[in-house]
A protein has these predicted regions:
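ABC ATPase NBD coupling module
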Residues: 2-20, 126
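Conserved ABC ATPase signature
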Residues: 75-79, 83
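Catalytic Walker B motif of ABC-type/P-loop ATPase nucleotide-binding domains
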Residues: 100-103
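H-loop/switch region of ABC-family ATPase nucleotide-binding domains
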Residues: 135-136
Length: 157
């Protein structure tokens, strides 16, 4: 697809169905619960006609990232940094995108959460998802990347 000539509908399809983005910061609509955030991403993939599957996948993803069920119906603005990041990762990864952009996906996560993130990244990679990430946690990256570029003093090494 030539993005310079793509229609708005084609670009929208790419953004909602083919691309995933994990930021170290959660940007969620106000009055949207943790469950709603993940479910919205799931529905973009599954569609309204497969709502039951989307619900089950959303619940499984929230559990995978240890987001306590007591938090599912709460607004994430009250969450810790690690909880927000895990929620953000769950919402991006539930889509099983073809391209996943990762901006510090392990920032503010404890080791147990990092293991879960790595496990899902490895699974997506095995399924053919292409990923481009920015990491400061070099230990986390070890053995995960096919190619690695290091920025030192403003230049790649």
């Amino acid at each position: 697809l030539d993005l310079a000539r793509a229609t708005q509908r084609q670009v929208l399809y790419l953004r909602t169905c083919e691309l995933g983005y994990v930021s170290q910061f959660l940007s969620a609509l106000p009055r949207q619960t943790a469950y709603d955030i993940v479910m919205r991403s799931a529905l973009e993939t599954y569609g309204e006609e497969r709502r039951g599957e989307a619900e089950r996948a959303s619940e499984a993803m929230l559990r995978h990232f240890d987001i306590d069920e007591n938090l599912w119906e709460l607004y994430p603005r009250t969450f810790s940094g690690g909880e927000k990041l895990r929620l953000n990762i769950a919402a991006a990864m539930i889509k099983r995108p073809r391209l996943l952009l990762l901006d510090e996906p392990t920032a503010s996560l404890d080791n147990a959460s990092k293991v879960k993130v790595r496990s899902l990244i490895e699974q997506l990679k095995a399924e053919g998802t292409t990923m481009l990430g920015i990491f400061h946690d070099l230990e986390f990256m070890e053995g995960l990347c096919d190619r690695e570029y290091n920025m030192q003093e403003g230049a790649m090494s």
